[in-house]
Amino acid sequence: GGRYLTKEIHPFSFEEYLEYRHVHLTKFWELSPIKNDVLRLFSDYFYYGGLSEVFNMQDKKSWLQSLYQKILYSDIVIRKGVRNERSLRLLIRKLADSVMQPTAIKRLQNILQGDGTKIARETIASYLDYLHESFLTFSISCFTDSITERETIKKHYFYDNGILNLFLFQPETKLLENIVAIQLYKKYGEDLYYYNKNMEVDFCVPKDGLLVQVSYRMTEDATRNREISALQKVGKFLNAKKCMIITYDQEETILSAELGMDIEVVPVYKFLLDEEKY
């Protein structure tokens, strides 16, 4: 037993998953029948994650549920001597609920206390460390000069969509932002931030001038204008070199005169498959 996740939560990338399923991408795969296979397999990968053991399970959800219980119990509760298991479980649920929102430790404390649990902020900070160490969750900081804000108000994500999906009802928008976070965090680590000063941008890598918004669908004008406007304002302020909007399946190029460059709207499966381009 022990250390399930150090072995198991280095999930397959989407490309590795396709290889595992014997789908080999050719140069022009999007124009070939392979595209249908890619889309079908992406749906599985999106909802159930990239842990190889889950791929051939009939009942994927219950396998993921039992893996989660094992990690929680063996890797965290027993290993770390957690006395308040109920609070830890509740904290994980709340992190899943708030995947897209910057969340302060103080707010987590209020939520847990509202549920009748007395818990110190230091304890919550320790629990968050345990979740990171056991590869259940990771977090990104706000891009700001305020050290306090950087340290205390973070966005929390799960290392695997399949495990996150155990906690969600109508999961699509959260799973989409989470899968983008996994990919960007793998690539940029501590250089990945979110931006939240007057305007919100889901992800930014200031040293590379990269800004990324995540929007499940861009069919409504209000959504579309909000995403573009945030990229334009923050892009000018941060001197962005590349701006992207990741969607579930929409693709287009938006010319931004204000930024003097294109904003690329990219379907998530393409974003995951072309690391060099994106």
Predicted segments with their positions:
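Conserved nucleotide-binding/hydrolysis micro-motifs of P-loop NTPases
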Residues: P11-E16, I163, Q250-E251
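Domain-level recognition of nuclease-like catalytic cores that cleave nucleotide substrates
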Residues: Q250-Y278
